Amino acid sequence: MNYLTTTNYCFPCQTHLYHGKVRDVYTVGSDMLVIIATDRISAFDVVLSRGIPYKGQVLNQIAAKFLDSTSDILPNWKLAEPDPMVTIGLLCEPFKVEMVIRGYLTGSAWRKYKEGERTLCAVTLPEGMKENEKFPNPIITPTTKAYKGHDENISKEEIIERFLVSKEDYEQLEYYTRALFQRGTEIASSKGLILVDTKYEFGKKDGRIYLIDEIHTPDSSRYFYSEDYQERFEKGEGQKQLSKEFVRQWLMKQNFQGKEGQIVPEMTPEYCQIVSERYIELYETIVGEQFIRASTSNISARIKKNIETYLMNKEQVKWNNMV
């Protein structure tokens, strides 16, 4: 099955191209971003060699729907979706931190807790907690934003002391983070899911804070099924979840955790297909709609055409308004 792992277009008025872990980001003019959600998959801050069919479409369309459903909380960068794998929006100056919020003790937080750590980003964790247990209140554990390599945990105090974010702006980011997580929790609950943890990225434009990048996708979030959560928790069983964690678990079974000297294992085509179906399952569960699979015939040409058509139409509207 076809998938798209990289692009290298040259659009009119394009000024910059950046290849992220899973997204290709084009700057057009001085105030517009064209972001293509590719089918690349990363774990432990390493991009794996094979792409996952439909993953980019799943991420892009989930993020777009959640951007629309949270726009009353704060403005966001999105302007249009000219293609199932593309969002075009405002260019904002990103804050140099990512806001991670956790409702449950799981994933990397649990691994550190199990090793005896009781503070995370200067947040004190209760004693006696078990894996996948709900925190009394969601905790915010920010990370530095690494364009290459590993993101690093950082405390609120360090962020302010290092002038990464002003105290006033950081407190606003905390407020938005909790409000977005509450909204995401409510939407997930209505679909029989638990929003376990997630991350948000913010930026500034003309003095206003905007929500940027993806939101509540399986790459940025972790979901449990709520139906049998309590039973599994009481039995000490692993939770059935919809997230990238199952890919991380697979990698760890292959003795890979992104550490220096470790060899990245290659996923088989069969396993890639399993991962693809898990992503589609999450889309249909959290969105509550059937996933319409876009054609995988010449994906790159389709995307290029759709973006160029949007940019041309936007330029025509701009020209007409000037006349």
UniProtKB/Swiss-Prot annotation:
The keyword Iron-sulfur does not apply. Keywords: ATP-binding, Ligase, Nucleotide-binding, Purine biosynthesis. GO terms for cellular component: cytoplasm. GO terms for molecular function: ATP binding; phosphoribosylaminoimidazolesuccinocarboxamide synthase activity. It catalyses: 5-amino-1-(5-phospho-D-ribosyl)imidazole-4-carboxylate + L-aspartate + ATP = (2S)-2-[5-amino-1-(5-phospho-beta-D-ribosyl)imidazole-4-carboxamido]succinate + ADP + phosphate + 2 H(+). It holds the Pfam family SAICAR_synt. SUPFAM superfamilies: SAICAR synthase-like. Pathway: Purine metabolism; IMP biosynthesis via de novo pathway; 5-amino-1-(5-phospho-D-ribosyl)imidazole-4-carboxamide from 5-amino-1-(5-phospho-D-ribosyl)imidazole-4-carboxylate: step 1/2. Its EC number is 6.3.2.6. The keyword Hydrolase does not apply. GO terms for biological process: 'de novo' IMP biosynthetic process. Belongs to the SAICAR synthetase family. NCBIfam families: PRK12607.1, PRK13961.1. This is Phosphoribosylaminoimidazole-succinocarboxamide synthase. The lineage of its organism: Bacteria, Pseudomonadati, Bacteroidota, Bacteroidia, Bacteroidales.
